[in-house]
């Protein structure tokens, strides 16, 4: 009994500590330069490292339909160097300084970041300012990166099982909005584009007023502000209005169904439901619902479809974080001998349960606990804090959401989950994709 009492006491103490960590405020300073660049500084001396990042408010949705893939191409192209930096030296310089770097592109934004020892902060600011205003964009760089992007497409999409999944969903779920193409775009358009088109895209979107610079970690705020002004203060505004897509996706009124054949061994079923943008309060409920269905061994899809019925080899569900109305996807890869129709029926049964019935108190508390755990995990390191600060400013214009968003999850009730599931997870609001082996295609 004493051992049990001790265990309970220890658990309570750990839970209390976790609760304090979850609610610990993340401090930051933010301001604008005269050229429109928004700057966010987060001071954290727990480790002698710093993360510098720039998020540009440009993604694949900003592209011309006849020039898809531009934003992703620029993710690569802007590592080519600059007027004051040798070609291909960007990565070498950061790695020589003991740092790491990367970049990624979504439908809504492009994100560059590097984490270095804190005594190398000034170096990263110089390099990001070079990327913003002095990038080397010429025929040599274009040809180099065309080859790189084509190879990436082969590896990640063409030669990967189910690699075309997102492309198929985007192309069929959307008819009007530019989410209808994926960030990788089409190699044909990148090949056809002229140097002048790339220069115009760069001068339009990779400008101070379309970016947020975030620096987090072991920094001296006063010194950092001086360096920010030194390297970014002299960069001029872009000089023209930044175009934003205005297309609105029509409301879907009937279920869509698509068969797609690829080099896979087992059929897969994808259910893609239209959902509101991440700014909408219902989006938080949708995140919790996808977590309920697929996150962990005790999730509903896992227990029912994989463990009990053995109809699926793998299952999953997630909602894309989109600035505009997007999709929440549920997928399953069928076990050998299981038809896609049977797998779809099993998935539908679990979806209908959350539409018609409130979840248990135990499940609900587990969802909230997981949201809190995810929040702590994302903000344990400077890189995670920096990414979140950039995201909250870019899409919400509310940087302090990093301290308040958790309350949005906590405010979702069991009734909200049932209501939101019933509203969005209807058959008329979805696309069903059967991702099938080529051997099943009728000749």
Question: Where do the language-model regions lie?
Answer:
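Bacterial N-terminal signal peptides that target proteins for export
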Residues: 1-7
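Bacterial N-terminal signal peptides
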Residues: 7-16
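His/Glu-rich zincin catalytic helix
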Residues: 19-91, 113-116, 125-128, 199-304, ...
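M16 family metallopeptidases and their MPP-like homologs
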Residues: 42, 47-60, 69-73, 87-132, ...
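Short, conserved secondary-structure transition motifs
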Residues: 150-156, 247-260, 369-378
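Generic recognition of flexible, low-complexity loop/linker segments
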Residues: 199-202, 257-258, 316-319, 405-406, ...
């Amino acid at each position: 009994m004493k051992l049990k009492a001790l265990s309970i006491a220890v658990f309570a103490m750990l839970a209390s500590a976790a609760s304090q960590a979850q609610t610990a405020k993340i401090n930051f300073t933010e301001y604008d330069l005269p050229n429109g660049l928004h700057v966010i500084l987060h001071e954290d001396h727990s480790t002698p490292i710093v993360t510098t990042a720039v998020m540009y408010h440009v993604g694949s949705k900003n592209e011309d339909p006849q020039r898809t893939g531009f934003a992703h191409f620029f993710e690569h192209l802007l590592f080519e160097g600059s007027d004051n930096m040798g070609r291909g030296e960007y990565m070498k310089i950061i790695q020589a300084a003991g740092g790491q770097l990367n970049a990624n592109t979504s439908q809504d934004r492009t994100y560059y970041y590097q984490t270095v020892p804190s005594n190398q902060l000034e170096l990263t600011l110089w390099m990001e300012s070079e990327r913003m205003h002095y990038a080397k964009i010429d025929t040599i760089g274009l040809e180099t990166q065309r080859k790189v992007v084509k190879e990436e497409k082969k590896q990640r999409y063409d030669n990967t099982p189910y690699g075309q999944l997102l492309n198929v969903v985007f192309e069929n779920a959307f008819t009007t909005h530019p989410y209808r193409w994926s960030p990788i775009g089409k190699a044909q358009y990148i090949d056809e584009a002229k140097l002048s088109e790339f220069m115009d895209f760069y001068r339009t979107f990779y400008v101070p007023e379309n970016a947020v610079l975030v620096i987090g970690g072991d920094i001296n705020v006063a010194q950092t502000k001086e360096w920010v002004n030194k390297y970014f203060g002299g960069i001029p505004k872009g000089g023209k209005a930044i175009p934003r897509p205005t297309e609105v996706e029509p409301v879907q009124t009937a279920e869509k169904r698509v068969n797609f054949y690829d080099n896979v061994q087992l059929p897969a079923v994808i259910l893609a439901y239209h959902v509101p943008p991440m700014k909408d309060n219902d989006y938080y409920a949708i995140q919790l619902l996808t977590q309920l269905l697929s996150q962990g061994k005790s999730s509903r899809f896992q227990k029912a479809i994989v463990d009990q019925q053995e109809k699926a080899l793998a299952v999953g569900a997630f909602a894309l974080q989109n600035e505009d109305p997007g999709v929440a996807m549920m997928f399953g890869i069928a076990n050998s001998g299981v038809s896609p129709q049977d797998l779809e029926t099993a998935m539908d049964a679990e979806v209908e349960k959350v539409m018609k019935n409130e979840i248990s108190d135990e499940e609900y508390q587990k969802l909230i606990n997981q949201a809190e755990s995810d929040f702590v995990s994302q903000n344990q390191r400077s890189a995670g804090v920096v990414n979140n600060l950039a995201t909250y400013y870019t899409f919400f214009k509310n940087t302090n959401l990093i301290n308040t968003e958790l309350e949005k999850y906590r405010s979702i009730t069991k009734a909200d989950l049932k209501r939101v599931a019933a509203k969005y997870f209807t058959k008329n609001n979805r696309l069903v994709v059967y991702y099938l082996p080529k051997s099943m295609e009728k000749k």
